[in-house]
Each structure stands twice: as structure tokens, then as C-alpha cells.
Amino acid sequence: MDREYGSYNQRSVNSYGNQSFSMDEMGDSNFSRFGPYESYDSRSSVGGRDLYRSGYGYNDHEQGHFGDSYDGRYENPYRNSVDSFEGRSQGGSSWDPSFTRSKVRTGFMEDRGRDSYSSYGSFSSPYMKPAAVGSRGRGMPAYPENAFGGRSNDAFGGPSKGRGRGRGQMPEYGVMRRHRVVVEYKHLGVAARGAARGVKRKMAPPFKPVGFFGKKQKLSKPGANQNKSVPPPAEKLSEEEEEKRRTEARREKQRRRREKNSEKYGDGTAFTCSFCKFRSFDEKGIEEHLTSATHQEMLDHIQKQTKFDKPVMEFLHECIVNKFKKTVARRVQSVANEAAKTLEKDVMEGVNPDDHMMKVETVHCSACSVYVPALHSSVQLHLKSADHSKSKLTYKEQIKRESILTATSILNNPLVKARYELYLKGENPFETQPDEQQQEQEEEEEEEEQQEQVAVSEQEPSEQETSDEQAAAIAAEPEGEDFTCDPLTTTDEV
């Protein structure tokens, strides 16, 4: 459809009166429509309210709010940009005027649309003049002296940047598009950058220096793994050699255990009950324990937890009694060979008076894992302490748990199973040959070692705690106690 552009231009110009420029001025060149710049209004001062001024009272409350420093005689580009922004925010198209021609007053109109026209015939400032039709097309600046037309935020669809800030030295404008605005920040100043905030920007890759490289992966040399020497495969031994090797290792282990017990308990062999964790150096003490109610109560607890038959529990009791008898025989043999034994080294060898050390007797509490001085007052003080009362109950429960493990491990031993078969037949299972006796002794010692390891893992004594307990016990003795007695010659019975 053909259109008469000339008639359109003529009608648009005639519809607005009091224009400060005419079609003749615009015919010379595209930019001749802009008059010379005048920094001062050449009109005479008009008293009262200016009829051609915008309807806003800039001296009212909004003036103080926006910080305006201009009086009412000068038109403010910030207010015009706000009016233009409000016109678009009300749902109207940016290409259609936000007013009806019937409401237009001669010589005045609010600038509300992107293509709307204002009549500023009485204003001589060229930056206040509106652009002609099509002058604010896509990618074109609105005004010659300002890349953003003094209303820079209009190009981005946002609020104006403020009054009195659009007349300075303007930076170069970037590339702007209507539907997708792309801003190149390299050539924009501070004011333009602030105007472009909130606009979708190009996602540039992060800057990396020229010599910057990412984390290098650790590379292994191809021949590194080949240089590692592979251990030769172990030679397969026959069953007899393997059994012999295990026997020698077990005997060496038992020998070290005997030396450890000798250093711990002395040359005297201790009598022990594996179920009750009872230890005594006196034959009478172990005999009384095996016939006591405490030992019988422990056997009943084992039977209740393991569901063993009565013959099994009787056999386990006989095993403990047989162990006691073997210990007695070993002690007699050691006494016979006492003459051939080397003399024991003196414990106090190398101790000088300056070392302030002395040999004393102590009482060991297995429940608390502490050593108490062999004094009546110290022992009684420890018995009445709250720690001992609590540790005593805990230690008793621990013994009950370990007794079940001990009974189960004894019955799982192949040698003990063979003896149990003989015991059920009515034979004496403990009459063995010397070789079997040696093997049995090694197995019993190994069993005791396992039991002690379990006990140590659950409750390991601390030397520091022991010394602290001893110091506390000595410091807490009553004031009336006589400390003049010699601990080495004391006759207090513990």
C-alpha cells in the first residue's frame, strides 16, 4: 500500500503550533534541524508561573526529594525523562504516543512516548528540542551532544540517571539494539556504566594470564613401575617343615613369656584361676579359692550363658585343678635346681643415696590398676574411696564376660576335646606322656597370654595414674598417723 510521506510530514507539522523550527530548516541536511547551542535562555524573565513550563511543580516536595537546583523557568531534562518512562510503564507501546490529539494544548505537551513530540517553541536551548520523525530509530542517538540524548536510561528502558548530570563530557556510545541490548564497557564512562546496570551482558570467559596453566596431572614415567623389584615367590615348605617352624616359633614365644612373668612376679610361680582371674603365690590360697563360693558362682554363670551340660562344667573345673597340680610340680622342680641357678641381680644395684630411692612393699588393686602403699591407713583409705567402689563393680562384670570367652576357647582346643572324650569314658585324661605334657603346657601358657591381652586391651594400667594415686593416698592420711615407723620393718598386716 502506497503512502504519501510528504502529506504525512505536512500534517504532523501543522498539527502542532508554535514550533521553534520549520520544515525548511530541516530540508538542507539531516542534521540542520538542530539549531546552534545556546547555554542561556535569551527570553525575557517572566514573572509568576510560566505557562509553557511542565505541569510539575519543581519547587514542591519532589524538588527537595530529587535534589533539584534549578528554578521554575528552566525545563529539566530529568523530569522529561521521568515523564517518558512513566508513559511506557503504563502498558503503552513505545512507538505510539501516550496521548490523544484532542487533549493537546497549543505550545505544550508532555513528552511521554518514544516517538511523541513536544512543543518547546519558547525554549532556545537546542538540547531541549525533540527529534524529528524517525530520528530516534534503532541504533541512533537522540541528541547530537549526548550519545544517550540527555535521557540515557530511556535507551535501556529504565529510570533516568538524575538531574543536571547529562551535560558534561559524554563518552562514546556502544552498540545498542532494541530487543537485546549489548553494552561494550570498554568505551563507556562511569555514568554510562551505571545506566547499563541490570541489562543482560555478554558472558566473557574468565581472564587468564599468558603464562597461566591449569593444574598439571602427575605423570608417571613409563619405566618406573618396571624398575621395581618383584619379590620372589616364597618357597613352598612341606607339611613337616611347616609344623616344625610353627612349633619353634611357639616355644620361643613361651620362653619370652616366662622371662616376662619372672620379671613381673619374681622366681616364684603364681597359681592362677583362668575363670576368676585369681592369682596367688601360696598353695593354700589357690586351694581355698577352688573350693570357695566365688569360684562356684562363676562356673554357674558360665553354664547359664553358654548352655553347657553339667559334665562339661565338671570337666572345666578339673582342668583348673590339674593346672594347679602342674604348677606345684613345676615349683618343686625349680627349687631342686635352685643351686644351679645364677644369683638374682640386686634390685637396688646402682642406686646411690643421692637418688633418694628405697625399696618398699605395695598392694596392687586389680580393679583400679593401682599400687597402694603397704600401710594399713593407705589400704583402708583406698577401700573406702568412691573410685574403688565403682571400679570394683565394673571389674567384676569384665571378669564375667572374659570367663565365657575363656571357657569357649578351652573347649575349642583339639587336645582338650580329645581329653573330654576320655573324661566321658571314665578314664583319666590328664595322664599324658612327656611330649604331650610339653605341648599342653605351651598351649596353656598361650591361652593365658591371650587372656591377659584381652584384659589389657579393655583396661590398660597407666603409670602416671598409679603415681598420682599413691601420692594422693599418702597426702590424705589422717593427721594422727605415726610416720616415724619404717615401711621396711612395719608389722602392719594387710
UniProtKB/Swiss-Prot annotation:
Segments of skewed composition (Acidic residues):
433-451
| Statement: the UniProt record of this protein carries the keyword Coiled coil | no
Chain intervals annotated as zinc finger (C2H2 AKAP95-type)? 273-295, 365-388
Q: Which InterPro entries match?
A: AKAP95 (IPR007071), ZF_C2H2_AKAP95 (IPR034736)
Coarse class of the primary localization is nucleus
Where in this protein would one find the motif Bipartite nuclear localization signal, according to its record? 200-221
Q: Which GO terms describe its biological process?
A: mRNA processing; regulation of DNA-templated transcription elongation; regulation of RNA splicing; RNA splicing
| GO-annotated molecular function | DNA binding; RNA polymerase II complex binding; zinc ion binding
List keywords of the entry alphabetically.
DNA-binding, Metal-binding, mRNA processing, mRNA splicing, Nucleus, Repeat, Zinc, Zinc-finger
Q: Does the keyword Zinc-finger apply?
A: yes
Annotated region described as Disordered, given as residue ranges: 1-22, 147-170, 202-264, 429-494
Polar residues: compositionally biased ranges: 7-22
Which GO cellular component terms are attached?
DBIRD complex; nucleus
Locations listed in the record: Nucleus
Which PANTHER family does the UniProt record give? A-KINASE ANCHOR PROTEIN AKAP 8, DBIRD COMPLEX SUBUNIT ZNF326
- Subunit field text: Component of the DBIRD complex.
Give the UniProt family note. Answer: Belongs to the AKAP95 family.
- Tell me, in a sentence or two, what this protein's role is: Core component of the DBIRD complex, a multiprotein complex that acts at the interface between core mRNP particles and RNA polymerase II (RNAPII) and integrates transcript elongation with the regulation of alternative splicing.
Provide the protein name: DBIRD complex subunit ZNF326
| Annotated organism of origin | Xenopus laevis
Lineage here is: Eukaryota, Metazoa, Chordata, Craniata, Vertebrata
Its encoding gene is what? znf326
